[in-house]
């Protein structure tokens, strides 16, 4: 869950949280690095992050290069969490299940190319979640139109609301 100022890393097995940690790394840090590297405002850095992100073809890879130190830390932390799970899962949870995928949520999971970079770095499938997928079958209410990339910012809120509805 990549937020504005921090990222929560959560391992779920069979729908149950078995490990969680938070790191002080989020979209604001991406923007600060871009603003400093390109001498632009925070707003221009935010637009650069969303529109160019990790696209090596844009601006001769300069935006990618500016973001790389931060996304590399994120990849390292994810790798550390996966390793921790594999080292400790059997004694804590029985036979360990392999981590098959990394689901990205949070407003700053929208960093262009992040899922591709992380998939390559971790050698695990990474993808942007769809927080509204299957969220309300059989319920007589509607959710205002929301694009998938916008819904990522509300994944936690949607999950908490669904917990109350399904209870």
Positions of PLM-derived features:
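Hydrophobic/aromatic-enriched cytosolic interaction surfaces used to assemble or bind macromolecules
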Residues: 1-167
């Amino acid at each position: 869950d990549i937020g504005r100022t921090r990222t929560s890393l959560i391992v779920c097995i069979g729908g149950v949280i078995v490990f969680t940690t938070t790191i002080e790394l989020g979209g604001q840090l991406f923007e600060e690095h871009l603003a400093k590297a390109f001498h632009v405002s925070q707003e221009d850095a935010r637009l650069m992050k969303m529109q160019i992100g990790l696209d090596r073809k844009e601006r001769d890879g300069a935006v990618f290069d500016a973001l790389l130190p931060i996304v590399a830390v994120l990849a390292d932390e994810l790798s550390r969490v996966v390793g921790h799970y594999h080292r400790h899962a059997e004694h804590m949870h029985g036979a360990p299940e392999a981590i098959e995928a990394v689901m990205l949520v949070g407003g700053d999971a929208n960093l262009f190319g992040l899922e591709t970079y992380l998939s390559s770095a971790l050698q695990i499938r990474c993808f942007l979640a769809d927080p509204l997928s299957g969220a309300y079958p059989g319920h007589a209410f509607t959710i205002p139109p929301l694009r998938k990339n916008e819904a990522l910012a509300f994944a936690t809120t949607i999950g908490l609301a669904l917990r109350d509805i399904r209870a």
